[in-house]
Amino acid sequence: MPSNMKQFCKISVWLQQHDPDLLEIINNLCMLGNLSAAKYKHGVTFIYPKQAKIRDEIKKHAYSNDPSQAIKTLESLILPFYIPTPAEFTGEIGSYTGVKLEVEKTEANKVILKNGEAVLIPAADFKPFPDRRLAVWIMESGSMPLEGPPYKRKKEGGGNDPPVPKHISPYTPRTRIAIEVEKAFDDCMRQNWCSVNNPYLAKSVSLLSFLSLNHPTEFIKVLPLIDFDPLVTFYLLLEPYKTHGDDFLIPETVLFGPTGWNGTDLYQSAMLEFKKFFTQITRQTFMDIADTATKEVDVPICYSDPETVHSYANHVRTEILHHNMVNKVTTPNLVVQAYNELEQTNTIRHYGPIFPESTINALRFWKKLWQDEQRFVIHGLHRTLMDQPTYETSEFAEIVRNLRFSRPGNNYINELNITSPAMYGDKHTTGDIAPNDRFAMLVAFINSTDFLYTAIPEEKVGGNDTQTSSLTDLVPTRLHSFLNHNLSKLKILNRAQQTVRNILSNDCLNQLKHYVKHTGKNEILKLLQD
């Protein structure tokens, strides 16, 4: 029988010796990576619950229909810091949940917390390899806090809040908001994968709330375009890197100035409020805002019957992919024809009006096709980011770089890199992505819910949509953390994310990554690291 280890390269090895059942639960919840020092810049500390009651509760919830409580409890036991002794239990520290730990008392070999009243002692038999920033503590009594004020990670060489870099040109109010959100997202991803607060979610909800309260006609214009991924919604609504033209989806006068939004946070429960916006995609919402008392108004079908819009889009999809000539010439032209019909006549297969007049007017001149290709690319890159075992700023920088330099929205038709027929002509040569790979992405785009996209109320998502199949294995546990650990609030977002992602194979995602890496510039990585 093998002897027990005396030094440890991993916390999981120590757990295997002391509590293999708990280790199995952590593994089954796809959380082993959370115990790896490589994931965190400042090492990692695990709080082992000595109390059988806590471990039994974790087990009960882990193997229930809703494991979110087990995940949250386990995350409260993981600190993204290397804390080997009570002397290091100081300053701004917290658990993987993002909750700040308030220390009541430290002794030579003991720490007592205020919130949760946990009594912690270092594990006497845990000695990490010299090059591993790992620590294990034993929780003798009490519990780790699941709720409370967040902690702020201190930056090396400066204060808690790094200044927003000013060296970007042009530096517009839209750009300023985007940079602040990107830096906040990068910070919280490095802390806890944004499990406590998602900056993209917060800003998207705030902007939509502002429009709903102060500019209802703008609100009904943009509502059919919002996406279940807050990151996608944020960039499509704000268009922060557009530097040419004045055809913004939301005018400058609405967003900025004495009575403008100006990036103000306007939310109480971002997740619940974000979900509510999708439930407002109804006939009644449109009629309440449109001046139906003084003029006759056709209710757009995206409001009156959004499920049928998706059905007609699916007919177009089927026609394109079952055409007797699916190739690099015919297929992209059929895609363009479908979007041209929508942009010019506000119909899909002569069925319409699909969007409010204000919406379709804002989407002409290839903007609708540009938007939907943008959705597709960001969804793919975002999934790749969230599926990584460890977070790297460089991976997120690829997304930002693509948005800033390859798809800013300055020339919609020239920025089409997957759907444009020009990309498949004999005379077109490009070093960024092979033609066959590009065509594979085009087919994947047609198969996705990003094709001829319209937002759909939450009760319709994943219902009768023919694209939706067995999807539960496609949503990683970390995505739950990224959005929120309240599973009941997440149901709508999870279902929508699954629908979007079903068609994105790993090969397609790798092609997207390759494409982005070879287009754009390196300034974004430098920007995020400043």
From Swiss-Prot:
The keyword Membrane is annotated on this UniProt entry: no
Residues of the site described as Cleavage: G158, G159, G463, N464
Protein induction: Expressed in the late phase of the viral replicative cycle.
Keyword Heme: no
Keyword vocabulary terms for this entry: Disulfide bond, Host cytoplasm, Late protein, Ubl conjugation, Virion
GO-annotated cellular components: host cell perinuclear region of cytoplasm; virion component
Lineage top rank: taxon: Viruses
Family statement: Belongs to the asfivirus polyprotein pp62 family.
Protein name: Polyprotein pp62
Gene source species: African swine fever virus (isolate Tick/Malawi/Lil 20-1/1983)
